[in-house]
Amino acid sequence: MGPTSPAARGQGRRWRPPPLPLLLPLSLLLLRAQLAVGNLAVGSPSAAEAPGSAQVAGLCGRLTLHRDLRTGRWEPDPQRSRRCLLDPQRVLEYCRQMYPELHIARVEQAAQAIPMERWCGGTRSGRCAHPHHEVVPFHCLPGEFVSEALLVPEGCRFLHQERMDQCESSTRRHQEAQEACSSQGLILHGSGMLLPCGSDRFRGVEYVCCPPPATPNPSGMAAGDPSTRSWPLGGRAEGGEDEEEVESFPQPVDDYFVEPPQAEEEEEEEEERAPPPSSHTPVMVSRVTPTPRPTDGVDVYFGMPGEIGEHEGFLRAKMDLEERRMRQINEVMREWAMADSQSKNLPKADRQALNEHFQSILQTLEEQVSGERQRLVETHATRVIALINDQRRAALEGFLAALQGDPPQAERVLMALRRYLRAEQKEQRHTLRHYQHVAAVDPEKAQQMRFQVQTHLQVIEERMNQSLGLLDQNPHLAQELRPQIQELLLAEHLGPSELDASVPGSSSEDKGSLQPPESKDDPPVTLPKGSTDQESSSSGREKLTPLEQYEQKVNASAPRGFPFHSSDIQRDELAPSGTGVSREALSGLLIMGAGGGSLIVLSLLLLRKKKPYGTISHGVVEVDPMLTLEEQQLRELQRHGYENPTYRFLEERP
């Protein structure tokens, strides 16, 4: 047989598949060719982006991309167009073209750029000159504008800016938020646009600023504008007193003042000025216990009064209350604007009812905020008075302890006396500043409380007179400390005479004619039933400590010997000597007085025989309404022959 041709040999054999080692390179080549022909830009969605959100992106000279709603991957334009997506109006048109089923109404540029891999710009080859790019996409948003809800982590602050005369892009508003946070030493945590005025144009921005990760404790950011800083949970700020006097509520409320500590006791011993041991307690508690702690200033002020200083707590609560009010008003205004845009086709009566509904919501909101303000002020006033009383009580206790030393040391007594006088002067300043504030916001109310304020200042001076009268028990010590005491009293003396000078427009001529306000609605002041019973008064006296009994006596007693005499209290020291009574008239008056006295004694003896257990009055005692509470206590104590145990203790000492 002759040799057969290759065709004949091929026809005689069956076809066999190529070996397996040849299939693997062929499949890889086919896959690479498909990727090159399709020219896909594989951009993995970032963690911050939802997989199915409608977005578009484009760079000049490269294929325009859009995001697939099902897979979340970036796909090239089906028509292989190359658009420069710079104008928001053109971006809106392209979004409507790529997502016709979503009814796109607006676009918004993303806050940060995202990476794009293998964006090769339509090349048929499998290689890219620049395989990686970063582009800022545009969000294609359907429906009306709704502001993004921002989360405020613990230690961060929520702020916002509105500029009705400027219509800027979202990128510019985002930059403004970053600059505002950076100016306070914070970093931007999140931002959202407010008040749209066009396609990707807005009149405001809301943002959240947080402390840097390297410094998680926000107490180091005390410097700066108090309206945007994170408030610490301890310590006091310098100069806070002036801030509180300026930043008062707009409505006439009774604001109170807590003075930040000043360098008043530089001469005191170092061990007496030790810092409180509980300054770092809140930090330790927050780390150990998993219970969430309130971050709002109002909740912290009402819920944890010991965690923060009174002055800082009141300022922070007042500021956070106003911020909360602004957030709630902005939310209501957004809902009102959305409802108004949706009700354009409704009848006029329905639209008017809708407006009245939102107006009632705003009015209710203002009433709630006003109630919170009043509650905040009342709580602050109560705590201020308690702080002042505690400071004065502690200072008085130290002064009594220094006097009871054996022998009393002049330096220690002077130091304790200085602390006590400063506590009393602080109460005087607080009373005057409160009166000045009320006179500025409500002159009528200030005129009504004028008599009470002057009486309170007189009581403070009487209390100082009685306390300094204790020095008479040691004449040598009183003579030695007399010059220093005079300097302390004259250095910063605030008495009833300062009341006229504290309010502009007041005259000193009205001081003598000052009368208590007449009010028909005020009920007559009555003493409690137990005040007339000797047994109940003695039992109540046993429950009091010697210091409390002394304070009651000092608050209601007349001045004794004291080197400082106020001209506003002791007005009758120089009696006129030009008046006199004839001898005949004097003898007649003495005879009539003796006869009347004998009748009174006889009547008392008869009544005592009828009532061997004494008189116990269970009725209402008529009290002169001109008397203050301290003067009423003075009369009642003098009726029962009350003696100060402190005086007796000092007099019976050897």
Swiss-Prot record:
Monomer and homodimer. Heparin binding promotes homodimerization. Binds, via its C-terminus, to the PID domain of several cytoplasmic proteins, including APBB and APBA family members, MAPK8IP1 and DAB1. Binding to Dab1 inhibits its serine phosphorylation. Interacts with CPEB1. Interacts (via NPXY motif) with DAB2 (via PID domain); the interaction is impaired by tyrosine phosphorylation of the NPXY motif. Interacts (via NPXY motif) with DAB1. Residues 636-652 are annotated as: Interaction with DAB1. The gene is Aplp1. Residues 508-523 have a biased composition (Basic and acidic residues). The record marks 624-625 as: Cleavage. A motif (NPXY motif) lies at residues 644-647. It comes from Mus musculus. Proteolytically cleaved by caspases during neuronal apoptosis. Cleaved, in vitro, at Asp-624 by caspase-3. Glycans are attached at residues 465, 555. This is Amyloid beta precursor like protein 1. Its main location: membrane.
